[in-house]
UniProtKB/Swiss-Prot annotation:
<keyword id="KW-0375">Hydrogen ion transport</keyword>
<dbReference type="Pfam" id="PF22919">
    <property type="entry name" value="ATP-synt_VA_C"/>
</dbReference>
<keyword id="KW-0472">Membrane</keyword>
<dbReference type="InterPro" id="IPR003593">
    <property type="entry name" value="AAA+_ATPase"/>
</dbReference>
<keyword id="KW-0813">Transport</keyword>
<comment type="similarity">
    <text>Belongs to the ATPase alpha/beta chains family.</text>
</comment>
<dbReference type="InterPro" id="IPR004100">
    <property type="entry name" value="ATPase_F1/V1/A1_a/bsu_N"/>
</dbReference>
<keyword id="KW-0406">Ion transport</keyword>
<dbReference type="InterPro" id="IPR027417">
    <property type="entry name" value="P-loop_NTPase"/>
</dbReference>
<dbReference type="GO" id="GO:0046933">
    <property type="term" value="F:proton-transporting ATP synthase activity, rotational mechanism"/>
</dbReference>
<keyword id="KW-0547">Nucleotide-binding</keyword>
<dbReference type="GO" id="GO:0005886">
    <property type="term" value="C:plasma membrane"/>
</dbReference>
<dbReference type="InterPro" id="IPR024034">
    <property type="entry name" value="ATPase_F1/V1_b/a_C"/>
</dbReference>
<keyword id="KW-1003">Cell membrane</keyword>
<dbReference type="Pfam" id="PF00006">
    <property type="entry name" value="ATP-synt_ab"/>
</dbReference>
<dbReference type="GO" id="GO:0045259">
    <property type="term" value="C:proton-transporting ATP synthase complex"/>
</dbReference>
<dbReference type="InterPro" id="IPR005722">
    <property type="entry name" value="ATP_synth_F1_bsu"/>
</dbReference>
Amino acid sequence: MATGKIVQVIGAVVDAEFPQDSVPKVYDALEVMNGKEKLVLEVQQQLGGGIVRCIAMGTSDGLSRGLKVEDLGHPIEVPVGKATLGRIMNVLGTPIDMKGEIETEERWSIHREAPTYEELSNSQELLETGIKVMDLICPFAKGGKVGLFGGAGVGKTVNMMELIRNIAIEHSGYSVFAGVGERTREGNDFYHEMTDSNVLDKVSLVYGQMNEPPGNRLRVALTGLTMAEKFRDEGRDVLLFVDNIYRYTLAGTEVSALLGRMPSAVGYQPTLAEEMGVLQERITSTKTGSITSVQAVYVPADDLTDPSPATTFAHLDATVVLSRQIASLGIYPAVDPLDSTSRQLDPLVVGQEHYDVARGVQSILQRYQELKDIIAILGMDELSEEDKLVVARARKIQRFLSQPFFVAEVFTGSPGKFVSLKDTIRGFKGILNGDYDHLPEQAFYMVGTIEEAVEKAKKL
């Protein structure tokens, strides 16, 4: 193992000098004793003359020139396998939950090759989430990739927590959760939510919060992914949750600027598409096992054409778009049924009935959207009888797309609901066919199945 010394520290960027014959390779991990703490650096560039430029994985407070640096001779390696379940780890795979060491011999490098073309598998099996609007409009594929797009405060994290809870309880598989640059409070809420629903022993948690340096936030997604890859290569169907992909991009932007690269559009890093590809190409299913991933994507200023969300779109099978307009109506989950799409919404995959009901729901909502202008100017009375019926059904459908969540019970006071796909299709088909035209629209708000709406109507 080669030893060098620190020659320059600028925030999270540290330059170290090594003997000319033993310069560390790019992506090698280096270790510095900073007081009593060990700090890990990752080599990003070789500057020549034995000097390497590194990004710190922790705070560089207290570092000084001349400190001894050791080359570990390999990239950052993290523990993998069943020992990681139920534990909270940081970017280096070190436990941060005060429950002692992680007992495992096996450690994998966080930089790995994506599976080759021959190894990839293509499955058309659906993953039932129990959330009506998602199962109907943008069904998820087992081994597929889903993006939850939304601006600030429209419910990305709550939707993700509900998905994890439902899938962990109903499907009893393993999950890995990577918290990338999110709030520590959310990580804490999440941990307690998993403990309360008794699914903590099926989830590995990897956190790199907002207050961590950019190098940490850029690599923490890879740490979580590596743990998921291990479960996949053991032949399991694993779920990978990433909250938030935008912060991964943002950390890349910060690192890129610190390393002195020229920025590209909107100030993002010039390597935006490549960095996203490196992560996304590894999140895939092979003939051995599958990784189904759900990724929250923050949309800056609610602009879906921003380079960061736009780059993410290209990699996904299903996009769930959360809308501020729908949230302001008090309809949660605030999924926009006209903007959300899925590759699986195809009669050959979901069946003709599901496809027809989903498209029927979308077309009636689209017609309602068009009639809104007329209603705003002339009022409801000026509409034809046919259009009045469309509006009445559309408003019922809009309310029936809402649903009480298990993870939001604390806030709403109403118990959560898991609705099977069969019940979802039956309910919406009934509304489209006019079977429930006699019920008031309030009856459809925040209920599970259509039977609950009928019961609620009796009490109104």
